[in-house]
A protein has these predicted regions:
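Alpha-helical bundle regulatory/interaction domains
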Residues: 1-38, 84-227, 232-234, 238-244, ...
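Generic hydrophobic, amphipathic alpha-helix propensity
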Residues: 215-219, 263-268
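Glycine- and acidic-residue-biased ligand/ion/polar-headgroup-sensing regions
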Residues: 49-51, 58-86
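Short, conserved glycine- and acidic-residue-centered signature motifs
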Residues: 68, 212, 264
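Short hydrophobic/aromatic patch on the recognition helix
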Residues: 247, 251, 299-300, 304
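Alpha-helical DNA-recognition elements
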Residues: 253-254, 265, 306-307
Length: 322
């Protein structure tokens, strides 16, 4: 059985421009300081076979140029910048996303109090995302890079997720020594980045809308076609063929609610339909609640009242009819 090594961890405290520039020169990156002062910050990186995550924070404006490795896509999210910052001449600020193809040149001005989280994803692992993003696929994209800003909806949450992940990697040793945990984090952040990128590019946003609608329709079909009204979230994922994160995003994009809320509302509607249809059959509210997966009668009544503005017993008796 092959030996599994823990993730490679690198945490460098930036104390001056000379030492940091010397460190980066080994990675074919040139930097220079644009304003007087003492450069401070940190450069943290965790690397596993599935990719790497880097977090760079600096206090002074820098000019930086270099070339990314040829075997990986680089996905970067700016999480903070308090003065003008550029990437390939395009202005970037908190919430800006830039994606570089393998081996691409990067050329930027990084402003005061600049913070960026970068994900390196091996080409073979990133391939699965390219069909969903034709505008960045090599051979179809006009450039080897793309710079956009995440849409206002969800931008703050995206920044916080990336910052939170970076803080965890830097400060939680128990987490970062777990290969499985780090690889899972890379996969989650990559999916978040790709979704944000698609939403920010008009042509990709329309594609995301179509994909989301298709997932929701598939989920609805799974519920309608089966007699199993207590379908769980994991079963819905299997029925639609997508992960929980993708399922959640599709439902929020199309319906404005998460899949768990949708399932609950679906079961409440089915319960209401049964209460109306079974009025003359002697079926009790408890029997209907249990049939549709509500095992706590008090909670069922409360949720039902909130949903329909009346108690289930009122629906069953038909006393609400004019």
């Amino acid at each position: 059985m092959p030996q599994v090594f823990p993730p490679e961890f690198f945490d460098y405290e930036i104390k001056d421009i000379d030492a940091y520039a010397g460190l980066l020169s080994d990675a074919r990156v040139e930097i220079s300081q644009l304003l007087p002062g003492r450069l401070r910050g940190h450069h943290t990186r965790v690397r596993v076979p599935a990719g790497e995550i880097s977090w760079i924070k600096t206090n002074l404006p820098l000019r930086g140029r270099g070339q990314f490795p040829s075997g990986a896509w680089m996905l970067s999210l700016v999480t903070r910048a308090s003065s003008l910052s550029l990437q390939h001449g395009a202005e970037v600020r908190a919430g800006s996303l830039f994606v570089h193809q393998p081996g691409a040149i990067h050329d930027g001005i990084y402003g005061r109090n600049f913070s960026v989280v970068c994900i390196g994803v091996p080409s073979h692992r990133f391939e699965r995302y390219l069909d969903r993003m034709p505008s960045v696929r090599p051979g179809r994209a006009r450039r080897t890079w793309r710079v956009v800003r995440a849409s206002a909806v969800g931008r703050t949450d995206l920044i916080e997720r990336f910052n939170g992940a970076a803080r965890t990697l830097r400060h939680d040793e128990a987490f970062r020594v777990s290969m499985t945990a780090v690889e899972s984090m890379i996969d989650d952040l990559t999916a978040d980045f790709v979704n944000a990128l698609r939403d920010a590019i008009p042509s990709e946003a329309q594609s995301a809308l179509r994909d989301g609608a298709a997932i929701v329709r598939c989920a609805e079909a799974a519920l309608i076609s089966g007699s199993e009204h207590t379908l769980q979230l994991d079963e819905l994922c299997r029925a639609t063929g997508v992960a929980k994160r993708s399922l959640s995003r599709a439902f929020r994009l199309i319906l404005g609610i998460g899949p768990a809320t949708y399932l609950r509302h679906y079961r409440l509607n089915e319960a209401r339909r049964a209460l109306v249809q079974d009025r003359n059959r002697g079926t009790t509210v408890t029997e209907v609640a249990l049939r549709f997966g509500f095992h706590h009668l008090g909670r069922f009544s409360e949720q039902y009242q909130t949903m329909f503005g009346e108690a289930p017993s009122v629906t069953r008796s038909g006393s609400n009819r004019v």
